[in-house]
């Protein structure tokens, strides 16, 4: 089913007070005969099931998610359930050794959401040294350094490729399979950085 038509129909169902449901592909054993997954929406095929589920919940107003294949990993099921119950996104990433204390912490999102970055609400730290000031690729996790003055210590996630900025230290990267989650973060979302297995 096409994405735009699917969203339109779901909003009509919601207007009638009906629950909406959709399938996402499994991540371990795919169904015969194509072994490509069995999602409701073609757009979800090839996506990590957790990312596909978040997209369906956020963009198409889906109430219930089903796995369209024989098997799914417990980790992915936990991520989906936790997002549905708590509005918290688990984002797998790699953080530089110095910043690994950021793993498994819950962060809120600032209410003023720019188009190009996600700004986390966390205490700012003055005097952060200038290091790893690199081009900021989509999915980069950055911390503002002392050149950012009062914003020193602020943590952001880059939503689209941005040029080098001397006041931004790249401290980690979102795993490529999870980068599309950045499109669905709003001011109500909370996130947790998870270490890659």
What kind of region is each of these model predictions?
Residues 1-96:
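Catalytic alpha/beta core domains of metabolic enzymes, predominantly
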Residues 94-197:
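C-terminal functional modules
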């Amino acid at each position: 089913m096409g994405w735009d038509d699917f969203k339109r129909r779901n909003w009509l169902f919601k207007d009638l007070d009906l629950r909406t449901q959709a399938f996402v592909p499994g991540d371990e054993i795919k169904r015969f005969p194509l072994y490509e997954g069995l999602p409701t929406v073609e757009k979800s095929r090839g996506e990590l099931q957790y990312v596909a589920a978040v997209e369906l919940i956020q963009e198409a107003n889906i109430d219930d998610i089903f796995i369209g294949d024989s098997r799914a990993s417990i980790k992915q099921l936990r991520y989906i359930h936790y997002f549905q119950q708590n509005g918290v996104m688990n984002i797998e990433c790699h953080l530089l050794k110095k910043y690994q204390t950021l793993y498994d912490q819950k962060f809120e999102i600032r209410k003023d959401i720019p188009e190009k970055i996600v700004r986390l609400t966390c205490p700012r730290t003055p005097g952060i040294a200038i290091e790893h000031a690199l081009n900021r690729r989509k999915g980069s996790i950055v911390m503002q350094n002392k050149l950012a003055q009062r914003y020193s210590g602020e943590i952001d996630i880059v939503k689209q490729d941005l040029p080098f900025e001397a006041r931004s230290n790249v401290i980690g990267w979102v795993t490529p399979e999870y980068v599309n989650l950045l499109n669905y973060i709003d001011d109500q979302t909370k996130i947790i950085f998870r270490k890659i297995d």
